Amino acid sequence: MIDIGIVGGSGYTGGELLRLLSVHPSANVVCVTSRKLAGKPVTSVHQHLRGLLDLRFEAPSPAEIAQRCDVVFTAVPHGTAMDWVPELLDNGAKVIDLSADYRLPVDVFEKTYGIKHRAPRDAVFGLPELHPEVAGASLVGNPGCYPTGATLAIAPLAKAGMVDRVVFDSKSGISGAGAEPTETSHYPNLAENIRCYRVTNHRHVPEIKQELSRLQNDIRISFTPHVIPAVRGILTTAHVFVKDSFQDTIQDREFISKLYSDFYRNAKFVRLVEGVPMLGNVRCSNFCDIGFEIEKNSDRIVVISAIDNLVKGASGQAIQNMNLMMGLDETAGLWFPGGAP
């Protein structure tokens, strides 16, 4: 069994880690931290886990956690993980960080988040479908939810060098805003409504650019997110405008289908679907469903991806990374369908 610690276990991503790990065949959660809730039962916050967990929140030091754990997940606010990660690593634990602290180069992180990085370390970007090196990593920076859905949506087209410009329109459930209500996520402001926020220059854009530029370095990228009155899920619509030399190519549906099936041949959690993916089919699962439609006599192909923002967009992907880092089957503890309808 793998002894596991969770730093910051009281929020949505911490709770989702606990839900998934509670039925993982090789996971043994031994420590869940929360300074504010230290001493209280974990199930006092995550009541859906009653009968499955018998743990209390703790407030140990990083060294104490590392000495008890093989793997530690840091599910804390941006700018906080960097105060934990070095000591966890130095004391022998492997770390998957669910904040933004280790996703980007230091200079890009500081510019994007306005935070001085106090503890840079080399990390692997934790999108396993594009980064097989996750398997040998000691520190993984788990991707943001929007970059996961956006990058997976068009990676095959980028790898083929086809993309001139892409406009991402993402619609996310309220849980993406975290457990504390904000003006954007407060139910009376969102019920029967859709809210657009951070219309330009969203802080996830650098992650999307970073990953797509590894595949094709001249893509122009625009991204705008919306919050919808749903709890879970992200539906990303990618309007891909191809280079002039590929305008005839994208009219060939069989070619595009093969491009995607070849690219994702070994990606166990990517499902290619006919037509438009549905959030209900991936809800509470680690799958990313991808479909596309070709605009006739045009330079545009529309690619749609659907993920659960808390699972493939956060905690599930973190466990997928853990599986690879620890030499387990990638699907361990994650091979189950979505919760449709």
Curated annotation (Swiss-Prot):
<feature type="active site">
    <location>
        <position position="145"/>
    </location>
</feature>
<keyword id="KW-0560">Oxidoreductase</keyword>
<comment type="similarity">
    <text>Belongs to the NAGSA dehydrogenase family. Type 1 subfamily.</text>
</comment>
<keyword id="KW-0055">Arginine biosynthesis</keyword>
<dbReference type="GO" id="GO:0003942">
    <property type="term" value="F:N-acetyl-gamma-glutamyl-phosphate reductase activity"/>
</dbReference>
<dbReference type="GO" id="GO:0051287">
    <property type="term" value="F:NAD binding"/>
</dbReference>
<dbReference type="GO" id="GO:0070401">
    <property type="term" value="F:NADP+ binding"/>
</dbReference>
<dbReference type="Pfam" id="PF22698">
    <property type="entry name" value="Semialdhyde_dhC_1"/>
</dbReference>
<dbReference type="InterPro" id="IPR000534">
    <property type="entry name" value="Semialdehyde_DH_NAD-bd"/>
</dbReference>
<dbReference type="InterPro" id="IPR050085">
    <property type="entry name" value="NAGSA_dehydrogenase"/>
</dbReference>
<dbReference type="InterPro" id="IPR036291">
    <property type="entry name" value="NAD(P)-bd_dom_sf"/>
</dbReference>
<keyword id="KW-0028">Amino-acid biosynthesis</keyword>
<dbReference type="Pfam" id="PF01118">
    <property type="entry name" value="Semialdhyde_dh"/>
</dbReference>
<comment type="function">
    <text>Catalyzes the NADPH-dependent reduction of N-acetyl-5-glutamyl phosphate to yield N-acetyl-L-glutamate 5-semialdehyde.</text>
</comment>
<dbReference type="InterPro" id="IPR000706">
    <property type="entry name" value="AGPR_type-1"/>
</dbReference>
<comment type="pathway">
    <text>Amino-acid biosynthesis; L-arginine biosynthesis; N(2)-acetyl-L-ornithine from L-glutamate: step 3/4.</text>
</comment>
<keyword id="KW-0521">NADP</keyword>
<keyword id="KW-0963">Cytoplasm</keyword>
<protein>
    <recommendedName>
        <fullName>N-acetyl-gamma-glutamyl-phosphate reductase</fullName>
        <ecNumber>1.2.1.38</ecNumber>
    </recommendedName>
</protein>
<dbReference type="GO" id="GO:0006526">
    <property type="term" value="P:L-arginine biosynthetic process"/>
</dbReference>
<dbReference type="InterPro" id="IPR023013">
    <property type="entry name" value="AGPR_AS"/>
</dbReference>
<dbReference type="GO" id="GO:0005737">
    <property type="term" value="C:cytoplasm"/>
</dbReference>
